[in-house]
Amino acid sequence: MKMKITKGGTNVSYRIDNTFLQIKNYNSFNHQINYELLKDFDFVPKLISNDQKEIVWEYVEGNEPVVDLNNIKAITNQIKQLHNSNLNFPKNNLKQRVQYYRQKMVELNSGIEIIDKYANLIDDILDKMDHSTPLHNDLFPFNMIETKNKIYFVDWEYATMGDKHFELAYLIETSNMNSECEKVFLDLYSDYDSYKLLLNKIFVNYIVILWIRTQTSAPYNTTFFEQKIINYVTKLTN
């Protein structure tokens, strides 16, 4: 039985019996990873086939998790396993993505003041990022599947080398992690720099605004993310 899956914004996906079929829709930044590299991670669904047009995974039945104290240890351990794997992922492309989104925003006339106001700060953050760690790069909770015994990380199409602080900040920000859970998460991860993490929290909210204002339809509501940038910049300067 073939059933279309509506979740996900780039590719066209279907469940076919016990498999997950994804028809690839390429942009300049996705599907660059060699998916075979992921085969040794027990938190990645089994890869069945992959070619230029489509990729097929084992279908995992489960739910999108709420990241909290009940599962943060398992999630952290998996992130550490990935970051310490020494796998050679594609070259980081965050700088190119930001440039592309900014130009697209001009074309769509969807810009807002905060994007220009903090452009120099963002460029400086990008210039100083480390690129030595293999990253998933899109660890929204909706790219996780929670089962009875495991949390799977899925949708690896944007995976590249990069700065571990980006991955940490990305999960904290996109999951709206509360302060107690964040402290446990960072204590468990342990090997991080709090200043670099703060810079990457600013960057994550910036790129989320860019994405919303270039990849979704108007009206745009990015006030929440704009305020988070302002709050984090205030912390940066205090």
UniProtKB/Swiss-Prot annotation:
Coiled coil regions in record: none
Top-level division of the source organism's lineage: Bacteria
Family listed: Belongs to the peptidase S49 family.
Record protein name field: Protein LicA homolog
Organism listed in the record: Mycoplasma capricolum subsp. capricolum (strain California kid / ATCC 27343 / NCTC 10154)
